[in-house]
From Swiss-Prot:
Organism placement in taxonomy: Eukaryota, Fungi, Dikarya, Ascomycota, Saccharomycotina
Organism, scientific name: Saccharomyces cerevisiae (strain ATCC 204508 / S288c) (Baker's yeast)
Domain of life per record: Eukaryota
Region (Disordered): 660-692, 714-761
Keyword terms, alphabetized: Cytoplasm, Phosphoprotein, Repeat
Assembly description: Associates with the nuclear pore complex (NPC). Interacts with GSP1, LOS1, MSN5, NUP116 and TEF2.
The protein, known as: Cytoplasmic export protein 1
Length: 761
């Protein structure tokens, strides 16, 4: 319904409530709407009158009586608007019509229905000096606390000075408008008879208590007053045995009690709840959520204040009530999880409870935590609950550690990336080596459950899972090993084929040799599943390399590979031809001038060959030709031609700069001057050879087929081998190039690409 046109007709009027468009219920006189007060967002109910000349007196009487009657049990009136005939409103607390459609569910708890009847009797008791006249099924409402309240004061009149004729006339008019039958015209009995009919509507004859039947029949006939009817019911066994009636009276007065009195009331609630939880099921909507739970939360906060700090509190000054904290918290958690309703401040209560050191409190929170995730935001869980929650994994009590472990999956979706992939995994690494078998088993199960949300960066997830499952497969107990195989089975889609081939199969393989036949059987099945995944991937591989040799697709008989003697001879001959060809191409050429005699060649080779080696390679001490000739008497002839060698390029070695280790002499040192010897040594050719400086010989490894060039030629030269050379065609410069430095031999790289597990624990 559009109320804007109505309010615009009122000059300078601002309606202080927001009203919904659709009515929740409607009678012949009223339309009932849910609304909200603009000032503080308080939920309200707005009754809009359907004013007409026929019912105007009835509506105005209802508005007037709503202003002056402030009686418990009537709808609490906040404000009325009756200045305009088109906009007559009665604003009350938030109420809903009695759920007659759900009466069957409410009737399952007879204590709850009896409690509602007692609430109506209490309201009518306050109205003993008034005639209500409208008591019926349509006049019963339920407020936000689940209490039964009455609305509809169209016929309400004071008994003092009331004219029976005038009341009967108004009553007939009212029941004609609503289309119902007038129970009685007598103002003294109309409410009694209306109450009797209402009780019979609430309780079927088969459900009516035996000690109530007579009294209900009497009041239905108007034979007794409401006050007498109430007194008779209070004396029945049904009334006295109803625990909710007495508890409700105490609960209504809780706001005026001191902390000790509140604790007594809640202790009675504890006894009732622990004796029979069914008493608190199927109560009137709102009774548990908005009445019992908020009061329990308030008393728990007082007890928590005493438990957290030693500061004096009103409770603490009188007696120690900390032992009541656990049962009260258990009742609150159980009630909220059943009704799935959470009062204001419930989140703070839960977060503060996690800070308590009491193991029983923490255990309760862990049990109910999966059901409490709804009202808690992700930030509250990650910042206020998780730091205290995770400490349970290091608790000395195994039961608490296990329960904490089981609760992890319900909060992982609310954790930050750092908490999930760093902190949590570190704690799980510790529980995997716990002394308790169940904890070790559950650790693997939890890792399997949260594996899908672990970080996949840098192969982190694959390494973590492989490490965890490998460790559990080595567990001395069978249960953790089976849990590891279960985790591998659930995680098969998380591994790519390369990871399976390189890591996962090696993880499963030890299970094939397990002592337990169950483990061996499951490991075999799992191994085949992973192998099947590899085979499927292998079938999808397409060979598109056009440059591949045809031999790649042929089978090779390695048993007879290279054993054919004829083929081996052909191959050896080919290798020898290649070797000689390389020598021919890389050997230096020498020229012999015609004016050099053969004697001079002998003298040049045998007399001064060693002495003419330069120190360019850093190992041979150089001497001048002139000083060397002083101790030699070469035989020369005019016909001996002089040989000229081809210049040789010497490659610089990596260790040429290491000149201070005593192995290499400086060129400027005194050792460069050859010493004179009185007794020259004789060569094998009977020629005198002057003693040379210290000779250093280097060897360099080369492959047999490597091309030999002058720069990299490697030979081994000694004095005796030099004196035995008889070939006259080899130039002296080639002797100089034959002495090279010794090459380094590369060792095996011990730090190969070993596939290490990235534990990240």
């Amino acid at each position: 319904m559009n109320f804007s046109s109505i309010f615009k007709s009122i000059s300078n009027f601002q309606f202080p409530y927001t009203i919904e468009e659709t009515a929740i219920t409607e009678t012949a006189l009223w339309q009932c709407f849910d609304g909200t007060r603009k000032a503080d967002s308080l939920p309200v109910t707005v009754f809009k009158a359907k004013r007409s000349p026929e019912n105007e007196s009835l509506i105005l009487n209802a508005v007037h009586k709503s202003k002056i009657l402030k009686i418990p049990g009537l709808c609490t009136v906040l404000e009325t608007f009756d200045s305009d005939p088109q906009s007559t409103f009665i604003v009350t607390e938030r109420v809903v019509p009695f759920p007659w459609d759900n009466l069957g569910s409410l009737s399952q708890n007879k204590f709850g229905v009896e409690l509602g009847i007692s609430q109506l009797l209490a309201t009518l008791g306050f109205l003993k000096n008034f005639v209500l006249g409208t008591l019926s099924k349509d006049s019963v409402f339920i407020n936000i606390k689940g209490e039964w309240v009455l609305f509809g004061l169209e016929l309400c009149s004071s008994k003092e000075g009331l004219s029976a004729f005038e009341f009967a006339s108004r009553a007939r008019s009212y029941y004609n408008i609503i289309g119902s039958q007038l129970p009685c015209e007598d103002p003294n009995t109309i409410d009694s008879m209306g109450l009797g009919l209402l009780i019979k509507s609430l309780m079927a004859p088969s459900c009516l208590p035996k000690d109530w039947i007579v009294n209900v029949n009497m009041i239905s006939d108007g034979k007794i007053t409401i006050e007498n009817f109430r007194k008779r019911l209070e004396n029945t066994e049904t009334w006295r045995s109803n625990p909710l009636i007495n508890f409700y009276q105490e609960l209504r007065e809780l706001h005026i009690k001191d902390p000790q009195g509140k604790l007594v009331v809640m202790s009675n609630l504890e006894n009732l709840y622990l004796e029979s939880r069914e008493i608190f099921r199927n109560l009137t909507p709102g009774m548990i959520e908005n009445f019992i739970i908020p009061e329990l939360c308030e008393i728990i906060k007082l007890l928590m204040t005493q438990s957290i700090s030693s500061a004096a509190s009103p409770i603490g000054m009188n007696f120690n009530a900390s032992h009541k904290l656990v049962p009260f918290l258990a009742i609150v958690l159980d009630l909220t999880s059943e009704t799935n309703t959470f009062p204001v401040g419930f989140n703070d209560l839960i977060t503060q409870s996690f800070k308590l050191p009491d193991r029983q409190v923490r255990f309760l929170l862990l049990i109910y935590l999966p059901k409490l995730i709804g009202p808690l935001s992700k930030s509250e869980i990650s910042s206020r609950i998780y730091p205290h929650f995770i400490q349970g994994l290091t608790d000395s009590d195994a039961t608490l550690r296990l329960q904490t472990l089981k609760t992890i999956p319900c909060i992982v979706s609310c954790l930050t990336e750092r908490q999930l992939n760093n902190e949590l995994l570190r704690f799980l690494a510790k529980t995997q080596v716990d002394s308790d078998v169940e904890i070790r088993t559950w650790t693997v199960i939890i890792i399997s459950k949260i594996s899908t949300i672990l970080s996949t960066s840098v192969g982190n997830r694959s390494n973590i899972l492989a490490t965890a499952f490998t460790k559990s497969l080595k567990d001395p107990q069978v249960k953790p090993r089976l849990a590891a195989l279960y985790g591998l089975e659930k995680s098969i889609e998380l591994f790519d084929v390369n990871t399976i081939a390189n890591k996962i199969l090696t993880v499963i393989a030890p299970g094939l040799l397990d002592k337990s036949p169950i483990v061996r059987g499951r490991a075999k099945i799992l191994f085949e599943e992973y192998l099947e995944k590899l085979e499927k991937e292998a079938q999808l591989i397409q060979t598109n390399d056009s440059t591949a040799d045809s031999e790649d697709v042929k089978d090779i008989d390695f048993e007879n590979y290279g054993c054919d003697e004829e083929d081996m001879n052909k191959e050896d001959n080919l290798l020898a031809a290649q070797f000689l060809n390389n020598l021919r191409l890389n050997s230096p050429s020498a020229t012999t001038p015609s004016n050099i005699t053969e004697s001079e060649i002998d003298s040049a080779q045998d007399g001064s060959g060693w002495d003419d080696l330069s120190d360019t390679d850093g190992f041979i001490t150089n001497g001048t030709t002139e000083s060397f000739d002083e101790t030699t008497n070469p035989v020369t002839t005019a016909s001996t031609p002089k040989l000229f060698g081809k210049p040789i390029k010497i490659n610089k070695s990596w260790n040429d700069e290491l000149n201070d280790d005593g192995w290499i002499q400086d060129e400027s040192g005194p050792s460069k001057v050859p010493q004179k010897h009185t007794r020259p040594q004789n060569s094998t050719l009977a020629k005198s050879i002057a003693p040379s400086s210290r000779l250093s010989i280097k060897k360099k490894k080369t492959t047999i087929l490597a091309p030999r060039n002058i720069a990299s030629n490697s030979t081994v030269t000694t004095k005796s081998s030099l004196s035995n050379k008889t070939a006259r065609s080899k130039p002296i410069s080639s002797i100089r190039g034959s002495v090279t430095k010794k090459g380094n031999v590369d060792g095996w790289d011990d730090d190969g690409d070993s596939d290490s597990w990235d534990t990240n624990w």
